[in-house]
Amino acid sequence: MQRSPLEKASVVSKLFFSWTRPILRKGYRQRLELSDIYQIPSADSADNLSEKLEREWDRELASKKNPKLINALRRCFFWRFMFYGILLYLGEVTKAVQPLLLGRIIASYDPDNKEERSIAIYLGIGLCLLFIVRTLLLHPAIFGLHHIGMQMRIAMFSLIYKKTLKLSSRVLDKISIGQLVSLLSNNLNKFDEGLALAHFVWIVPLQVALLMGLIWELLQASAFCGLGFLIVLALFQAGLGRMMMKYRDQRAGKINERLVITSEMIENIQSVKAYCWEEAMEKMIENLRQTELKLTRKAAYVRYFNSSAFFFSGFFVVFLSVLPYALIKGIVLRKIFTTISFCIVLRMAVTRQFPWAVQTWYDSLGAINKIQDFLQKQEYKTLEYNLTTTEVVMENVTAFWEEGFGELFEKAKQNNSNRKTSNDDDSLFFSNFSLLGTPVLKDINFKIERGQLLAVAGSTGAGKTSLLMMIMGELEPSEGKIKHSGRISFCSQFSWIMPGTIKENIIFGVSYDEYRYRSVINACQLEEDISKFAEKDNIVLGEGGITLSGGQRARISLARAVYKDADLYLLDSPFGYLDVLTEKEIFESCVCKLMANKTRILVTSKMEHLKKADKILILHEGSSYFYGTFSELQNLRPDFSSKLMGYDSFDQFSAERRNSILTETLRRFSLEGDAPVSWTETKKQSFKQTGEFGEKRKNSILNPINSIRKFSIVQKTPLQMNGIEEDSDEPLERRLSLVPDSEQGEVILPRISVISTGPTLQARRRQSVLNLMTHSVNQGQSIHRKTAASTRKVSLAPQANLTELDIYSRRLSQETGLEISEEINEEDLKECFFDDMESIPAVTTWNTYLRYITVHKSLIFVLIWCLVIFLAEVAASLVVLWFLGNTPPQDKGNSTYSRNNSYAVIITRTSSYYVFYIYVGVADTLLAMGFFRGLPLVHTLITVSKILHHKMLHSVLQAPMSTLNTLKAGGILNRFSKDIAILDDLLPLTIFDFIQLLLIVIGAIAVVAVLQPYIFVATVPVIVAFIMLRAYFLQTSQQLKQLESEGRSPIFTHLVTSLKGLWTLRAFGRQPYFETLFHKALNLHTANWFLYLSTLRWFQMRIEMIFVIFFIAVTFISILTTGEGEGTVGIILTLAMNIMSTLQWAVNSSIDVDSLMRSVSRVFKFIDMPTEEGKPTRSTKPYKNGQLSKVMVIENSHVKKDDIWPSGGQMTVKDLTAKYTEGGNPILENISFSISPGQRVGLLGRTGSGKSTLLSAFLRLLNTEGEIQIDGVSWDSITLQQWRKAFGVIPQKVFIFSGTFRKNLDPYEQWSDQEIWKVADEVGLRSVIEQFPGKLDFVLVDGGCVLSHGHKQLMCLARSVLSKAKILLLDEPSAHLDPVTYQIIRRTLKQAFADCTVILCEHRIEAMLECQQFLVIEENKVRQYDSIQKLLNERSLFRQAISPSDRVKLFPHRNSSKCKSQPQIAALKEETEEEVQDTRL
């Protein structure tokens, strides 16, 4: 970044914002980059501002029982705030004084007042000076207030972030990620631009009092008629506002429904394509869109009348003020023109400025109170450690995640029983609730000495992760004692990758030791993976590390924990995503050898790990089931496997699981709302399911993963598009909103890779931060960076003869705080938080406007209609002028009406009224025409929005995966949320305003040109200057806006990243490191935002200066060239003032239109995406009703005579090559093999070898070459949809969308209830579905959060059974499953798919043992394709992975003659607790 010219700028340069000229010039000539932006002043840095506010807030907390955040803000910013407020007031006062001088100038042309003619020129000079003074006062004042608002936002951003890192886990579990982002976006947004309006609360009353005093002097009591009308108008607008709020609330629910389904569709687009659900999803979303648009139209009409009421009120204000006085006393011309000018100022103050100011204060105080409540929430308390102890001891420890559960369930049950429902099964729904709060851990005792390994095992939900949380201090024990040294390292169950390089992720801010680092890399088996990257370990990983496989992420996470020098290592199921061989190697080399001298607690259920552990702790339902050594376990608890894992008690187990699931559901739906929910209030919010899921989404626009991925708010609209809070009302005229979105800024955690093998996060709308922290989203973007990470080496050359273990054990330097400010610059940060750069030009092209206008043919006719009415209005005004011009002098005094603006002009004398009545008649007619001309325009523009949404949705659903993989899910969702909302809400009324203002200016110029042709000559260069200035500014402005928007992404991404890794952050003590990173992200955004504000003020000031020059010219031309016509001077000067203020508004409005049209450009970009191959490449006849045509059957003799394909499931693969993108590197090369009908094939290979990719290639979800035949039919000879329907799919990432059970199982409604129930029975879902009210019609929301992961897998299995597919693709179906569900899946595969071809990708050996053939993939190619016997006889990967016990199971006859094998204890499930509901971990 460059040094800012502001530092050396003179006072004049600062006053006129001339210091921004270099950036404006550069932006006009070339594209701006981040390096072109100026550095921020030190006073605006996040460090300084946050320190200042934090100091005052701490002082407030220390001194008062009820601390007020507003007091801390007042002490920081009050005096500067008031100084700029006084400047603003003085600027507004000049507006009130201008009409006085205008009246004196007009009066000087009165034939009876000739003595004042000589001073007219001086009055003109005075009037012009007032304009100059106003310009010099207003612009610095507005900029100063915006600047203070920015500083307040930055300080509070930082304060909230710091508080977030300190919150206790219990508090985090009650706060949704959406609420946190809401605090950092819409609430704080109110300060940025709202602060400039805040002063009008006291300025407007003073201004109204001054104006009414001046008008009283002219018109006496009749002045209050106009004021009365304005007050009535303001109340009318308030009423319209309330009506609009009602429609907004109704519509918000519908938008939520649509966006939830859309986000689920985008997130699971691969599954949608695999299931061939494109048409079903499109129909579902379009139906919701239709309902939404009905309310959109109603809201738009109300807003239109609200907006047009202001435009058309000017005539009535003047008319009502002047008429009573004229009828009673008669009136002179000077008073009319002076009154018109006064009324213009009065109208703006009463109907616009005051309501905006009140709304600003209401919003700001509400935001401050919310932030204040948040800052007082309970903080995380670190346990008291004993640094001298070397052992880890737990004595009689009991802990609860939450107290008061009993009351909650009791009240919820009563509430449910009181509810009148048509369903008799509600009692079932609550029948299994425990009415007592159960401890997550109870009476736990163990003791391990230094250097020992404790293995913690247990079933899903037993409390293993909670045990580690308690040791770390995240969970407070209610009873008992915990003792350890406090120097902890932690590896999370779900690997957490921060944006940065691999090296930075492993070192994690700790001092760098080259040799320790290398030993850790080797022990964690990362060397081979790192060597594949061109930048080695300096490759920059985006959010979540999307380019890495799940196993690679898990190993990096483990390496981070191992690299830190600690006394106690907590490893929470670190091997969940590793293949058997890699897991075995890492356990031996890392956990057993490298860390041999360290105290380790490993959560695992693998028998091999239990055997090697010094001590074993087995948990069951939160209690200690066993504690001791492995040999003791075999002797004392021979039944522990079946007891814990529930093999012998399926019915009881599933009932318990359902109980925990529904209990968690009740808790989640009961804890909604922004404020802390007391237990006594929960009955109002108890769990409720209805036929429509929209009711529960009143405050949510995105489901939680999209809350995580993207939070967007629409600009300039009261509709809140990120929908976090229901009581947050955005000001109507918000120019910018600080919410992440891509082009207008988007915070995106990019879509999960379609072939990623890591964990997935099921969508939940009100997902708590705690749940967020227990899930990993495999998202991010790979960015290549040339420069290596800047890290400081602190170790010297290794001493001779040091072993790897010695090097590892050597204590690292205690100096762990890197010099962050020196080592992390904005460029690095920007790279880490990489975001897609849009290839959209800085200014909207004419082609975009043309395409937009021609989307709907009616729009052209509506625009012509608007033009015709405008011409009629101008013609009527000119006719009246002509009529007056031809009136005999004695009758002069009639009426001139210029219906160009709402600013009516009356010229009358008391002698005659008949022209006055003509004027009123013409005005009323034209008013009615003008009032309703905008309605067809608004209506048609909403129809255009409807068409564009439909086209874009169709385009996204039909786009190939190679295209969708290059886009981030947040970016796609932004098109459907933010951009469609702009097309629905903002664009119609902004275009209406612009057209209205443009026509007003043209009409006024036409009238002035008729009256005084000289002024028309002066107007032309001014308009040319305005157009040139706009074009010059717009180039830079839009680029700065783009950079500013992109600068928001790091802020919100960093917040979410920090929350996801919060336990890791705290365990490593890296909060200060991350606070500094956050401040860097804030400063990066501030630099862009400050420059945007400065250039915007430069532009506004230049417009004002042109206006002042024009007005000076007009004033002196009219004074010097007009003879005895006071009426002509009055019309010219009044219109000149109005022309220029309206022209300024029109220019600003045109910039708004251009900015909003960028949304249209983005939508068109998506509409123009390539589509998937919809037709076969060879010429064939179409298929009908799911069957191939007769011609196809004849051509393919393999197809049976009953016309059904596929019939057997034989599959032949020839030279298959797969790529992610066209022209990219092949991921799979020359794959060839064949599968017989009904055969089971297992895919083998290391993590990341391409097993899941092969399954995607079968479905043609990638760019493929080669050929695949099914039952003799080649994939080139039939359509894509028909090909995919041949497969049944159980994907790695389970897809449950918001809708009923029936819709989720059969979205096309092809099957009867009997058939669905039969299949549900087959897969073990009947008992689950029957537990819910409504059964098949029960509405699942938020990715099916009421279901366990196992139940979701069974849903996918049921879909495959219903599809009657002959080939089944299973991608790790047992990942995260409890053994019961796993047994159901195995049983169903044997029964329902007995005669089907099955291709299985699986890490569990026992599942693979059922396959007849195995396909081994290594280095993108087929290494082996053989039967299990051949693989076991050779030195293959499979032979290395399989244990002797599994070989005994496979071939018992080979061992029968040898010694009898020892009884084996079945391996415990290595589960990841992703779906544990009752412990919320």
Swiss-Prot record:
One Pfam family from the record: CFTR_R
Binding site for ATP 2: Y1220, G1245, R1246, T1247, G1248, S1249, G1250, K1251, S1252
Catalysed transformations (reactions): ATP + H2O + closed Cl(-) channel = ADP + phosphate + open Cl(-) channel; chloride(in) = chloride(out); hydrogencarbonate(in) = hydrogencarbonate(out); ATP + H2O = ADP + phosphate + H(+)
SMART domains, per the entry: AAA (SM00382)
Lipidation (S-palmitoyl cysteine): C524, C1396
Membrane-topology descriptor: Multi-pass membrane protein
Location, primary (coarse class): membrane
PTM-bearing positions, type Phosphoserine: S549, S660, S670, S686, S700, S712, S737, S753, S768, S790, S795, S813, S1445, S1457
Top-rank taxon: Eukaryota
Carbohydrate-modified residues: N894, N900
Family the UniProt entry places it in: Belongs to the ABC transporter superfamily. ABCC family. CFTR transporter (TC 3.A.1.202) subfamily.
Name of the protein in question: Cystic fibrosis transmembrane conductance regulator
Organism: Papio anubis
Gene it is expressed from: CFTR
